[in-house]
Amino acid sequence: MQFVDEFRDPELAKSLLQRLQKIMENQPHFTPENPLYLMEVCGGHTHTIFKFGLDRLLPKSIEFIHGPGCPVCVLPMGRIDVCIEIARRPEVIFCTFGDAMRVRGRLGSLLEAKAQGADVRIVYSPLDALNIASNNPDKKVVFFSLGFETTMPSAAITLQQAKKQQVKNFFVVCQNITIIPTLHSLLSQGQVKIDGFLAPGHVSMVIGSEPYQELCDTYHKPFVITGFEPLDILQAILMLVTQIVEKRCEVENQYKRIVHQHGNELAQQAISEVFRLKASSEWRGLGEIAESGVELTDDYQCFDAEVHFACQPHQVADDPDSRCGDVLIGKCKPADCPLFAKKCNPDNAYGALMVSSEGACAAYYQYR
């Protein structure tokens, strides 16, 4: 398949691995006991790494830390409870992406709410939800707007369309979050040793490569934005390792075929019209992070489901036995969690990292 097979070429992969091996052999201070730690921020990268066994092909002196770049994985239990309360209303059709259906809150999951009679539907875009609202004028249709900057443009454009069409029965629960403040929080805590970052490709397609420069300058960590194919990731690792060995600290872009310095400016304009930063947002396992989430601007407040239904915020503590938060910041591996593959598995996903198709625990379970 054109533009896919080229990025999975075994001979090219072998060449990149040999170059990496040669570099690491000349760095005796990096050993399996004291490895070079690279964080892949995005869950999509995590799955590519495990699906193609890249972690087993790399020198033993390179180790991955799995980052918080999966929006379902960092979804607080209290936010699920808000969604379930709204979905249970008889006048509501609740629309969500499929990954969010099985995430558990104190009140259960949206999948369980559907089984109990709530009208909960899986959609593939917010425009699908808007069409449902147009076709069901006697119902209140609520879309669960979830995701990083990757999904924010489609949500923003949908709300612009709803406003233009004067749709009165369409609302959103806003759970969109931003990547740069999250990485600021992670690095400022200094709890985990990270030598370099594989930055997410899809988010960067929207925000561009420029926003990472502040992180690079402040924390003196190199970043390489990368795509999602095996050769993308191997080339990005080579670029990161080269920077570290040469004692450089830069933002480099391996994913130039998709990502540009300033990102998608039309998408950014739509986002800035519809959304504004919140003072603080809660993340599962990470707590409150300043300016890491968004809410609707004044011109779009009429579409806010939580305002319309007068929802009260929920604070729900995570299970103390679960180590989702530690996995998210790289303090432990999924297999170190006492629930992994026992109480928590894909058929009975107790933690959000096992629910999502991008979760590190799901990747470990499926490929290890």
Segments predicted by a language model, with ranges:
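Short, conserved secondary-structure transition motifs
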Residues: N176-L183, G263-L266
